[in-house]
Amino acid sequence: MLKPLGDRVVIELVESEEKTASGIVLPDSAKEKPQEGKVVAAGSGRVLESGERVALEVKTGDRIIFSKYAGTEVKYEGTDYLILRESDILAVIG
């Protein structure tokens, strides 16, 4: 399993709908980049200049919304993930 370092989290993307409300099927090229995902792993936290470690506000299992162009896409064991910094997370769902 991927283990993120510091203030980074590993996200499994939640794919958007493939059809519009009127039933039109969208090709991959017309879909927007997903901004929602599920945290599958979280780093140990951010280190302050004083050396103190601050724990992350998100945890494994949280559903989140993140900045549109944030993070680095990686493929691991056939699954697509996104690794991003906690500061790129905009909200936790639920």
From Swiss-Prot:
It comes from the Bacteria. One of its GO terms (cellular component) is cytoplasm. It is found in: Cytoplasm. InterPro entries: Chaperonin_GroES, Chaperonin_GroES_sf, Chaprnonin_Cpn10_CS, GroES-like_sf. GO terms for biological process: chaperone cofactor-dependent protein refolding. Keywords: Chaperone, Cytoplasm. GO terms for molecular function: ATP binding; metal ion binding; protein folding chaperone; protein-folding chaperone binding; unfolded protein binding. It holds the Pfam family Cpn10. Belongs to the GroES chaperonin family. Together with the chaperonin GroEL, plays an essential role in assisting protein folding. The GroEL-GroES system forms a nano-cage that allows encapsulation of the non-native substrate proteins and provides a physical environment optimized to promote and accelerate protein folding. GroES binds to the apical surface of the GroEL ring, thereby capping the opening of the GroEL channel. Heptamer of 7 subunits arranged in a ring. Interacts with the chaperonin GroEL. This is Co-chaperonin GroES. It comes from Bacillus licheniformis (strain ATCC 14580 / DSM 13 / JCM 2505 / CCUG 7422 / NBRC 12200 / NCIMB 9375 / NCTC 10341 / NRRL NRS-1264 / Gibson 46). The lineage of its organism: Bacteria, Bacillati, Bacillota, Bacilli, Bacillales.
